[in-house]
Amino acid sequence: MESIKQKVPQIKICGITQDEEIQWLNEADVSYAGFVLYEKSCRYIPISKSQELFEKLNENIKKVAVAVNPDVTMVKQVMDAGFDILQVHGNLTEEVLAVTEIPVWRAVNLTDANIFEKLVREYRDLSIDEKITALLMDAKEFGSGKTFGWDAYERDEGKEMLRQLRQILEKEQIRFVLAGGLTPDNISRGIDIFSPDIVDVSSGVEKELGQGTGKDREKIQKFVRNMHSIV
């Protein structure tokens, strides 16, 4: 675990909807840009619009399609558009895994520590599909601006469950992504508790927290600056 803590987590900015936000991501030199393809989200944009935006991204920034219960048709559209990664919330079917030719980030929306404990049990001794390259831990409703109850993972029982999960992920060479309520002000605590490989922020760098009001350049810069100063 010590070797993990020494790594600087990569950054994903999620919920990109505007041209100016692309410029800010390029300036900040983040690793991933997320585009929400879920129509019920306040950050939703169609695949065609996402494509128009991400064509202006720096080449080193990976393009992540954020989907909820995607079907085979949608996955094919995502691949045709040129996305680099498929992030799946909700149901991930065998059919989707079979057809996808890009890496999959499996998102888990946590409501409490019991869900996390169940997750550890499911992943233990499980043969995980090689297309799943990351596990993303998020709050109950992604993009809500709320964390998933970090206090539980600062106690001994929570620390042990987290340790077990990290061991499983490392064995399977699956990256650990921390999402859900991250902000420039709490990123230090999040990294200290979870030692993630990647941090995923959306509402925490918006003009108004959790309102889908568009990103704020200064908050993006502060998030990146604060993260690098504590690792």
Feature-to-residue mapping (PLM):
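Conserved N-terminal beta1-alpha1 strand-loop-helix module at the mouth
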Residues: 1-231
